[in-house]
Amino acid sequence: MLNDIVDVLADPADLTPLRGADDFTRLVSESGHSYDVAKQGYVTLAAGKGIGHEGDSLEMVNSRETFLSNGHFAPFVESVSDALADVVERVAGDADPVILEAGAGTGYYLAHTLDLIQGARGVGLDVSVPAAKHLAKSHPRVGAVVADVWEQLPIRTGSIHALAVVFAPRNPVEFARVLVEGGEAVMLVADQGHLDELREPLGILGVEDGKIERLIAQSEGHLVPAADPELIEYPMQLGRDAIAAQVGMSPSARHLDADVLQARLAELPEQMEVTARAQLIRMRKA
């Protein structure tokens, strides 16, 4: 809940500390700004003109919840959680570890990580309000924040022990700012071959070439590689409903007409093997 993580939150306008007020119905900063806490338990922390990017729709969030809850990405979840646990063990010491997930979605990965790391607190940040509603109730030790990863993060400098980014936007400058000394960003990035069996028959978006190289180049001066990239690849057995949920939670959902997608799904086998393939990238604060 927000009261568990308010000590690491900051005013998005000027990064001054936030505290709860009026029985935690709002958060206020030392500079006098106030941010209402939604009845669902999340808070929107955005300065100026507010959130500038479109987040996942309710339909996309529901598809994500359906797909992930059936365990199709379990090896990805385990790998991310294990890496975060390794970071926390190394850098947290006697402090209560704080884990931030940027682009946390429904909180599926973050909740699993908090189950693994006893006593850790989680800050889930996402630009989508429908996602934040799920995120706020994903785990007792998660605080949900609606904020834009591309902007200055509403997080106090040097307050985060480990940071997760799973198939989500990355902001190396801000990640480095919020991490403690020695802290790491653990990033799961789709690799060439991910969902390849679905791309031609469904017309979904492909994985761009050189994503890993660009990530490392963009991080120069802020984050440095902490380990060699780890390839995670395995086959999934997916029925049509699971495939529909996978496409529905992805960026392709914004580009494909629903009727066209349904027609293409109907032409697929009732069950098919689909490749899951991603790289786990660990980068330490420079």
PLM regions and their residue ranges:
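Class I SAM-dependent methyltransferase Rossmann-like catalytic core
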Residues: 50-79, 83
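Class I SAM-dependent methyltransferase SAM/SAH-binding core
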Residues: 98-101, 105-152
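A short acidic, Gly/Pro-enriched loop at the edge of an enzyme's catalytic core
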Residues: 150-162
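A short glycine-rich, Lys/Arg-flanked "PGG" loop and its adjoining helix->strand segment in the class I
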Residues: 172-186
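Conserved class I S-adenosyl-L-methionine
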Residues: 184-214
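Short alpha-helix
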Residues: 208-222, 246, 250-259
